[in-house]
A protein has these predicted regions:
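Non-catalytic cap/lid and distal C-terminal segments of serine-dependent acyl enzymes
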Residues: 1-159
């Protein structure tokens, strides 16, 4: 953050905050930075991520893993935390297919959708079809679908 955010700020002439984008493990990272630092990011497009860090550690968790596990840190965020208003002014898009190799992404996105609803966070959780697999061909289609909505502002506060 100490290097990449100033680098982007020097070159960004739009006046808009950057959007974190990623697929698979990159989706988890995009979600983490957008949710941990809504002051620095205008949102995220997270495709086919797993948002429970304990998945990668066999259930083991410490404070560092917790801080990087959206399913955990959001669950325990107070419902009146000032970040929630910031989230609702951002484009938070989480999508997953329902085809091959997407099962863990589906289960953690269902958890995230439930947390978002309970906290009043207007993130867009989109579950694509049963033919949509954990693959680049689909991520290319998804980014072409979501990016224009982020750029025109129609994804802000989307339910």
């Amino acid at each position: 953050m100490d290097e990449v955010i100033p680098f982007i700020a020097q070159r960004n002439t739009s006046g808009r905050l950057p959007i974190a984008v990623g697929c698979s493990l990159g989706a988890m990272h995009a979600g983490i930075v957008a949710l941990r630092r809504p002051d620095l990011f205008g949102g995220c497009i997270a495709m086919s991520g797993i948002y429970d860090a304990s998945y990668f550690t066999g259930g083991w968790m410490n404070s560092k893993w917790y801080d990087n596990s959206p399913c955990h840190f959001l669950q325990n965020m107070p419902s009146d935390h000032y970040y929630i208003n910031m989230y609702n002014e951002r484009s938070l898009i989480f999508c997953v297919g329902q085809g091959a190799w997407e099962q863990n992404g589906i289960s953690t996105l269902l958890i995230m959708a439930s947390i978002f609803q309970k906290k009043g966070i207007h993130a867009w959780c989109d579950f694509w079809g049963y033919d949509v697999s954990h693959d680049w061909d689909w991520w290319k289609k998804q980014i072409r679908y979501f990016l224009p909505k982020v750029l025109d502002g129609s994804a802000i506060g989307n339910k």
